[in-house]
């Protein structure tokens, strides 16, 4: 769950939300209140944090926090 904790920290910072709101099943837009600009900034922050590149075609598929965690875990393999 280390990746989740790191993703959660980035999400909390970028969206200025309470850490308790961020769960694996949380939808980034619907549940956490992100708009399209927030999502772009979140992806950029995740890329910087994890030193990865997330193409737009992949970023649009990252709906839930769980999707982000799994995607990053797969990149790190």
UniProtKB/Swiss-Prot annotation:
Its main location: cytoplasm. Transmembrane segments: none annotated. One of its GO terms (biological process) is lipid A biosynthetic process. It comes from the Bacteria. Keywords: Cytoplasm, Fatty acid biosynthesis, Fatty acid metabolism, Lipid biosynthesis, Lipid metabolism, Phosphopantetheine, Phosphoprotein. GO terms for molecular function: acyl binding; acyl carrier activity. Residues 1-76 form the Carrier domain. GO terms for cellular component: cytosol; membrane. Pathway: Lipid metabolism; fatty acid biosynthesis. Gene3D superfamilies: ACP-like. PANTHER family: ACYL CARRIER PROTEIN, CARRIER DOMAIN-CONTAINING PROTEIN. NCBIfam families: acyl_carrier (TIGR00517), PRK00982.1-2 (NF002148), PRK00982.1-4 (NF002150). This is Acyl carrier protein. It comes from Campylobacter jejuni subsp. jejuni serotype O:2 (strain ATCC 700819 / NCTC 11168).
